Each structure stands twice: as C-alpha cells, then as structure tokens.
C-alpha cells in the first residue's frame, strides 16, 4: 500500500465518503481511522508534505536537526510514516477555498468543497467533511511590527524546521505563551547566543491562575514546563512583566523599546519575533455557516461542537486545534474521535463498535486536556496588547488601517465588525481578516465596554483563500460552482442557450470589485 499523491485537481475523484482539510496530527489520524473502516478518503493540505505546523517536514527532516527540534517534534514521524503507507488520496499544496454544507431542504444531501490543486480548481462532493485546519497565531500589533526582520515566532519556527534557518542575531523574542519558551529553547540548542526574551505575561499569583494550579500539577506538562523555563532563564536574558513594546528602525528592525515596572529600556535587535498565543483557525467553519462561540479563557472564537466534533452543520466535523487549543497529542485523539463520529453517522461503522472505540479515546483526551485551563489563565495576553493603545499602530496590514482609524470609525456606531468593513476596508485585503479580525473585535469590545462575544467577528464568505480568476475559469459553469465563486444563488443568474449559467460583469464585480492584481474582499486575485 502507498499514499496516492494528487498533483492536479482533475486527479481527485468527484465524490468521497470522508474529505479532510488539513494534514496535521488531527487530519492524519482522522484519515487513517476513516480509511481503516473502508471509507473513500481524501486529505487536502496547503503544505508540500504531511505533518501540519507542529510536525512540519517531519518525513524528510535531517537527523542532525534532532538535537534542537526536540523529542516532541520527532514523535510525529511514526504517525507520518503510517499515513504515507496508506491508500488515502492526498493532495499537497492544495487550497480549500469553499465549503457548502448539506441542505436537505433543497435536496442538497452532500457537502460541496471548492479546492485548487496544481493551478486548477474543482468542486468535490463528500458525505462528511472533517476540518482539521489547526491553529493560527494571535496577531500582536505593536509599533514597528510591519518592519523588515520582524516576524511571528511561528514563522521563525517554520524556517527552523523546514530549512534549519535562523534569524540574525541579536534576536528579541517578545510576547507570552508556551511557544515563546519552546522556540527560545530550540534557538539556544541550535547555537543562538544573543537572545533576549521579553515576557509580557501577567503575574502568576492571580486568583484566576492559582485556582487551576492543583489540576495542572497532575498534568503531563508540569515537569516539561519547569525544565523549559529553567533552561531558558539560565541561558538567555529573560525580562518579565513587560507592559509595552515598540520596535524601532527605519526600514528594518534595529532595536526594541519596552517598559516594565522599573521604567523604559531599549535594546538592540537585528530580528524580532512576536507571539502572544494561538487561536483556532475558523475561516472555513465560519464561511460554511457553522456556529461560533466566544471562549473567554482562550480569548478567541471557536466552533460549537459536541464531544465527538460534530459542528452545528450536518456532515461537517471539526478536529484538533481548530475546535479549541489543546496541543498536538490531544489533536491526534480528536481526529480519531471526529472520524469515528462521521463513520457512525454515515452508517459505515455500527453504533456499538464506535461506542467501544470512543470510550478509551475520550479518556485519553481528558488526560491531555488536564492543565489546559491553567495555561490559558497564565498566558492570557494583557489588554494593552489585545487592543493596542498607540493610535498609530497598524492593525490591518493589508489595507494599512491604524488603531486611530478603527477607533474613529467605531465612534460612528457601526453594529459590528462586518459593518466596520464598509467604513475602512479593514479585513478586506488578501489575508481576509486572518491578521486583524481578533484585534478589531477586541478594540470594538473595549470601546463599547462589552464582551467580545457581544461584538462578534467578521462573517466570511467563499472564497476564503485567495484564488486566481484563471483557476476559477476552469470550473464547469454549474450552479454550485457559480455560487461558490459569487456567493449568490443560481436563481439570481441568467442561463444561456447552451444551458450554461452566465456570469456578466456585474456579477463578477459583486464578488468584490475585481481590480487587476489587487485581491478582493472575496479573495479573488485578477
């Protein structure tokens, strides 16, 4: 048996029992579970090889990098090798840009997925779709974050895993969260000697943190976390209690100014890595109409699911960090659980057999979730970083919208973030809000003195990722393809004499005012 790697969209089948978006820990285990039950399975992933962000390039990485990437990274190799020996259809470098859920009221009994592979687009049907899209880094807009040589900690870690590349020294690593110290440890082991960690986490001795301490002490993360903190604090310059950060430089980062209880300081920097935690990637779940809810502990929106990963839309399941941040081991278990739920709902595995498999999996999941509440409370970002105070800080990098402009627009009392778009185009650039949505929600909540749950987030529509018109032009002119592109029902369009649905210039413009070489609000690139 061997993995069936797909290089173009035409190589994909028209229908799958289970279609999975994402080839990280959750996506791989979901695919293996479904394939073992005899289901027709496809995995669509943006990366060139399976593994996701946590196990990036695990199948081809060099042994000499083992010393600094650590044992947790190499745990993923066995899973990736099992995945590689399966008979699953696997499409690397694939972009999933549309997902329409089932709607039996109009006789649409299958999910429809829009995907681009190898420069061509295609619509695929699936009885069940498992979204294992993982997490994304929470944006950390500070003055100077748009300068050259400033990147997220996650981006630096990707370069380290994929190419063994390291930022130029001296390096400043700023923010909060477990990844901050993990990356610091990896950089130290890789040979970095001039490293400063600016820890923006609030005091550990808060009641919201201490009440979760007993459970955390029983978790599998305690000793690992203590060793990590001790190592970094012994081998790098760690500054705790940082309250504000500004990156200085004309065209590229040259230094960092920061404040603590002791006052303001400035240090030189050739590279600045920012990080303040991760949040679920909800673009597809949002665009598919799945219900989202605000998680106040993780300061993020997440899809509403049951204990088996079923979303509010029939036939759509969510697994891994895309349903709530829990880590790689929990994601592996979550993928298996979601796949079993899908197989049961499709009648491919009996209810009795699924129940027997789920019991030990739920037990494992509870073990991996133990201590998560402590970490969420400990690394809750400061409000001044969630909703930046400096009025000239850029929030929307695509459209260059500052904090000042956003606060001025909020003063005009738009109902929510979606209406704010019409004032500023904030969130209408090529990233489609991935880098600004969380910050806009936090600023609006602060201005109105309400919870982010009352504010909401951007409402997304397909395409949720940038797609070229040349790729979309290869789609057959069917009703479902046209709706995936324009977001409009087929009844709104004319049908020509040959039976094809026409899409006049006005329809294309309604997708987001297409301009040459400029991304539109719908993610279309001319």
UniProtKB/Swiss-Prot annotation:
Pathway assigned to this chain's UniProt record: Opine metabolism; octopine degradation
Top enzyme class: oxidoreductase
Annotated residues for binding of [2Fe-2S] cluster: 396, 398, 431, 436
Keyword check for Endoplasmic reticulum: no
Record EC number: 1.-.-.-
Annotated cofactor note: Binds 1 [2Fe-2S] cluster per subunit.
Cofactor(s) the record lists: [2Fe-2S] cluster
GO molecular function, one term: metal ion binding
One Pfam entry name: Fer2_BFD
InterPro entries: BFD-like_2Fe2S-bd_dom, BFD-like_2Fe2S-bd_dom_sf, FAD/NAD-bd_sf, FAD/NAD-binding_dom, Metab_Enz_Cyan_OpOx_G3PDH, Opine_Oxase_asu/HCN_bsu
The entry's keywords: 2Fe-2S, Iron, Iron-sulfur, Metal-binding, Oxidoreductase
Role summary: Oxidative cleavage of octopine into L-arginine and pyruvate.
Subunit structure: Heterodimer of a subunit A and a subunit B.
Family: To T-protein and to dimethylglycine dehydrogenase.
Protein name as annotated: Opine oxidase subunit A
Origin species: Rhizobium meliloti
């Amino acid at each position: 048996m061997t993995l069936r790697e797909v290089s173009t969209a035409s190589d994909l089948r028209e229908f799958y029992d289970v279609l999975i978006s994402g080839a990280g820990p959750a996506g791989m285990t979901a695919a293996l579970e479904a394939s073992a039950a005899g289901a027709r399975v496809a995995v669509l992933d943006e990366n060139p090889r399976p593994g996701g962000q946590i196990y990036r390039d695990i199948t081809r990485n060099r042994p000499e990098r083992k010393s600094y990437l650590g044992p947790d990274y190499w745990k993923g190799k066995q899973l990736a090798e099992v995945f590689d020996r399966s008979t699953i259809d696997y499409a690397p470098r694939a972009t999933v840009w549309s997902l329409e859920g089932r709607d039996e009221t109009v006789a649409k009994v299958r999910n429809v997925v829009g995907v681009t592979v190898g420069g061509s687009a295609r619509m695929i049907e699936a009885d069940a779709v498992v979204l294992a899209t993982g997490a994304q880094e929470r944006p950390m807009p500070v003055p100077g974050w748009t300068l050259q040589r400033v990147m997220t900690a996650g981006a630096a870690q990707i370069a380290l895993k994929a190419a063994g590349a390291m930022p130029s020294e001296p390096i400043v690593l700023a923010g909060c969260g477990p990844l901050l110290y993990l990356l610091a440890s990896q950089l130290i082991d890789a040979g970095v000697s001039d490293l400063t960690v600016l820890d923006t986490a609030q005091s550990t001795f808060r009641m919201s943190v201490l009440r979760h301490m007993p459970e955390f002490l029983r978790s599998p993360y305690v000793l690992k976390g203590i060793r990590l903190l001790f190592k970094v604090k012994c081998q790098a310059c760690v500054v705790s209690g940082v309250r504000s950060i500004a990156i200085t430089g004309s065209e590229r980062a040259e230094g960092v100014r920061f404040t603590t209880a002791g006052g303001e300081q400035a240090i030189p920097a050739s590279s600045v890595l920012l990080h303040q935690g991760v949040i679920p990637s909800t673009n597809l779940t949002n665009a598919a109409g799945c219900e989202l809810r605000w998680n106040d502990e993780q300061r993020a929106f997440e899809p509403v699911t049951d204990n088996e990963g079923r979303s509010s839309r029939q036939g759509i399941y969510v697994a891994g960090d895309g349903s709530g941040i829990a880590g790689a081991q929990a994601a592996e278990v979550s993928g298996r659980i979601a796949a079993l739920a899908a197989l049961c709902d499709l009648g491919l595995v009996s209810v009795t057999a699924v129940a027997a498999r789920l019991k030990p999996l739920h037990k494992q999941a509870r073990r991996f979730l133990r201590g998560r509440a402590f970490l969420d409370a400990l690394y809750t970002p400061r409000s001044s970083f969630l909703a930046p105070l400096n009025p000239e800080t850029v929030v929307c990098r695509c459209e260059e919208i500052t904090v000042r402009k956003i606060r001025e627009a909020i003063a005009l009392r738009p109902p929510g973030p979606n209406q704010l778009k019409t004032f500023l185009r904030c969130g209408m650039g090529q990233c489609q809000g991935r880098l600004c949505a969380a910050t806009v929600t936090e600023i609006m909540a602060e201005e109105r003195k309400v919870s982010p749950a009352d504010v909401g987030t951007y409402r997304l529509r397909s395409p949720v990722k940038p797609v070229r018109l040349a790729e979309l032009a290869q789609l057959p002119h069917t009703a479902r393809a046209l709706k995936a592109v324009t977001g409009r029902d087929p009844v709104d369009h004319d049908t020509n004499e040959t039976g094809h649905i026409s899409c006049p210039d006005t329809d294309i413009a309604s997708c987001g005012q297409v301009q040459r070489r400029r991304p539109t609000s719908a993610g279309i690139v001319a």
